[in-house]
Design a protein with these regions (language model features):
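Repeated loop/turn-to-beta-strand initiation elements of outer-membrane beta-barrel proteins
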Residues: 36-38, 114-116, 172-174
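Solvent-exposed loop/turn elements at secondary-structure boundaries
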Residues: 131-159, 163-235
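Membrane-embedded beta-strand positions in outer-membrane beta-barrel channels/transporters
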Residues: 24-26, 101-107, 117, 159-161, ...
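A generic structured-segment signal
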Residues: 104-133, 235
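Residue-level signature of outer-membrane beta-barrel architecture
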Residues: 30-33, 44, 104, 108-110, ...
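Transmembrane beta-barrel strands of outer-membrane/channel proteins
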Residues: 40-46, 118-124, 178-182
Length: 235
């Protein structure tokens, strides 16, 4: 039977960073008249995200056996991710998005035991133009019109909502609540900022396997555990 062993840090933790800043400005106006309480307002939301993810950034070696490892034979496979710059220092992609919203709702006390709430929210998310176009990718998928710096277009989200509160017995011992509506959340920021970091413009990954001759560079004294040493051996 085969035995599989891993030694060292996992391939996904090195270089991880997640930093998000959110600023929200809200202004509401409420007006009560008769059985109605009307609320209207506007909201501005800013989200900025910095992300670091270098899968296999600390180097990854796969050997056919323990004997191959201790005898310094060439590995079966190797991978490393590094920055696309001369000093190979990790870069942390950043992206910022904004969203503009307006909304209005009415709380109508139709009966002392029954309240109906209904409203409408309009949201316009705006995404920036990314500076991460991979020219080779653009040329390869020119027919489809795909580019690594594409972001979602600014579409208006229309979200109607309605809900009710029913005091069945009139003594608040049995209350039935319900509602429905359209609720649009934000796109996960990590998806957007990863488009910057993983487009092969900020960082790149080298993967060697099979009969790739460069694997022989890691035979003998070619095996290293420090990242500068690994990159020096590779390049």
């Amino acid at each position: 039977k085969a035995v599989y062993t891993t030694i060292g840090l996992d391939p996904f933790t090195y270089g991880n960073l997640r930093d998000v800043q959110t600023v929200t400005v809200t202004d509401n106006v409420t007006y009560a008249t008769g059985i109605h309480t009307i609320t209207a307002g506007a909201q501005f939301e800013y989200n900025g995200a910095t992300n670091g993810f270098m899968q296999m950034g600390n180097g990854y070696f796969l050997y056919a056996s323990w004997d191959d490892f201790v005898n310094k034979n060439a590995p079966l496979a190797f991978a490393i991710t590094h920055a696309n710059r001369t000093d190979l220092k990790q870069q942390f992609p950043f992206i910022a998005t904004t969203k503009y919203s307006v909304y209005a709702q009415d709380e109508a006390n139709l009966h002392k035991q029954f309240k109906l709430t209904y409203g409408l929210r309009l949201e316009l998310p705006v995404y920036p133009t990314l500076d991460c176009e991979n020219a080779e990718f653009t040329a390869l998928f020119k027919k489809q019109g795909w580019q690594t710096n594409q972001t979602p277009k600014a579409y208006l989200n229309v979200s109607p909502r309605v809900g009710f509160n029913w005091d069945v017995l009139g003594n608040r011992r049995m209350i039935v609540r319900g509602g429905t509506g359209v609720f649009a959340g934000n796109l996960p920021m990590v998806w957007l900022v990863s488009a910057v970091g993983n487009s092969n413009t900020v960082q790149a990954q080298t993967l060697l396997s099979g009969n790739n001759a460069d694997l022989q560079k890691f035979a003998g004294d070619g095996f290293k555990t420090d990242i500068p040493g690994i990159l020096q051996t590779l390049y």
